[in-house]
Structures are given as C-alpha cells and as structure tokens.
Regions:
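N-terminal cap/lid segment of alpha/beta-hydrolase-fold proteins
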Residues: 1-13
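Structural signature of beta-strand start/N-cap positions in the alpha/beta core
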Residues: 26, 52, 89-92, 113-116, ...
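Conserved catalytic-core motifs of eukaryotic protein kinase domains, centered on the activation segment
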Residues: 39-41, 64-69, 130, 176-177
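Conserved serine/cysteine hydrolase catalytic core
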Residues: 132-184, 195
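Conserved acidic catalytic loop of the alpha/beta-hydrolase fold
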Residues: 74-91
Length: 227
C-alpha cells in the first residue's frame, strides 16, 4: 500500500493508506484492537483491483494520534469525520472485531454515506466477560465490550444497508451463537462461517476475499427505481 497519509478529523490526526482507482467504489477498512492498517496488507491490494480502498489507523493505533480518551463513540465519530472530510459516499465499511463495532455505529449514525457493511468476528452489544488488559487503549475498549451501551442494539436493528457477518467458528474466543443472533437482527443480513478463529482475514485470506467480493457485488449494485 502507499505510505501513510494524514488527515485532521475533529482535531485528531488520523493516518490512512489508500490504493485503487480513484473513481472506483470506496471501501474503508477498520482494523481490530492491538492492530493498525497494516493488518490489511494482504487484503487491501486484492480489493483494490476494482475498488478505492482506504485502510485507516484508528485513534491511538499505528501512525494516528494518541489521545487521552478512547471509546467506541469516539471511534465512530472519527470514522464519520473521515468520510465527511474526504466526502466518501456509498461506502462499504469492513470492520474486524473492534473495528466492526465502530462500523455498525457509523452505519447507524450516517446511513446516507454507507452502502454496505462487512463485520468480521464483531462482538455483539452484550457483556463479553473479556479479561481487561493493562494497555490503556485496550482497557477502555474492552471495558466497553464488557459493559456495552444497550442503545447499541438500536443501531443493529436500524441498519438498513446489506450486512455480511463473518464468524470464525469454535476456535474463536467470541461466542459464536451470539454473533449469529446479532447477524439475524440486521434487516438485510447474511452470516458466513469460516472456521479459522478470530482473525479470518489473516488465517483464511482467500475465503475471506471470496465472501467479501460477493458482498461487494451486491453492495455496489445501483438501487432499482420503483415505479
């Protein structure tokens, strides 16, 4: 991918990498916790054959600015600001784990900018019982996963764009039945299991890409006018 570019979003400097044809449909990749945009190094070039791909370092990760506050609402606002500043429309958001939570919150907040979601191993908005790490950023984020805002279910129920939910099967540490239950609540949702654990895009990139490309073909399709 091209080198880091920096953009100011609400006073926070976010780094991102971009590749693919400038006029192609946009895809924004949102990494999981303890990762950064380089997590998509094998995925982004493949998607960039026919999409404009933006791989973002979320606040406090990679080359993006460290701040004194971290929450999913702030991650949501950062991504909304990113879409606004770059004027990205009809975007497919692809989020892994933490990035998936931010993605569906963005789709709820700004449905006019989001045409599709891919949620890879994304925890549902219910207590996860995860061990809280010492690392400051992870402590805030995991704390919210263990005590999520019940209003996040409103976001899940209200997302109207097509949603592909990918789960990693029994070797994942996330409760697979709860991921399936969340997937079933999206009005236009589809659930695919790729049984390689929590990091599907790393451990089964070909299967991941096949599922995402099929979803993108649907998300990119222009809406049929009603007569």
């Amino acid at each position: 991918m091209s080198g880091d570019q920096i953009i100011d979003v609400g006073g926070v400097r976010l780094a991102y990498r971009v590749l693919g044809p400038p006029a192609a449909p946009p895809v924004v990749l949102l990494h999981g916790g303890s990762a950064d945009s380089s997590a998509w190094a094998d995925i982004a070039p493949a998607l960039a054959a026919d999409h404009r791909v933006y791989a973002v370092d979320l606040r406090g990760h990679g080359a993006s600015e460290r701040t004194d506050r971290y929450s999913f609402e702030l991650l949501r606002d950062d991504v909304v600001g990113f879409l606004d500043v770059l004027d990205l429309r009809d975007v497919t958001l692809v989020g892994h784990s933490m990035g998936g939570v931010a993605a569906y919150l963005v789709a709820y907040a700004r449905p006019e900018r989001v045409s599709g979601l891919v949620l890879e191993e994304t925890p549902p908005p219910e207590p996860m019982g995860l061990k809280v790490p010492r690392h400051e950023i992870r402590r805030h984020i995991v704390g919210q996963l263990n005590a999520p805002d019940p209003a996040w279910w409103d976001a899940v129920d209200a997302v109207t764009c097509p949603v592909l939910t990918l789960r990693g099967g029994p070797s994942s540490f996330l409760p697979q039945d709860r991921i399936a239950a969340m997937a079933a609540r999206f009005p236009h949702g589809r659930l695919v299991t790729i049984p390689v654990g929590h990091c599907i895009h790393r451990d089964a990139p070909d299967a991941f890409l096949d599922a995402v490309r099929a979803h993108l073909r649907h998300a990119d399709r222009p809406a049929t006018p009603h007569h």
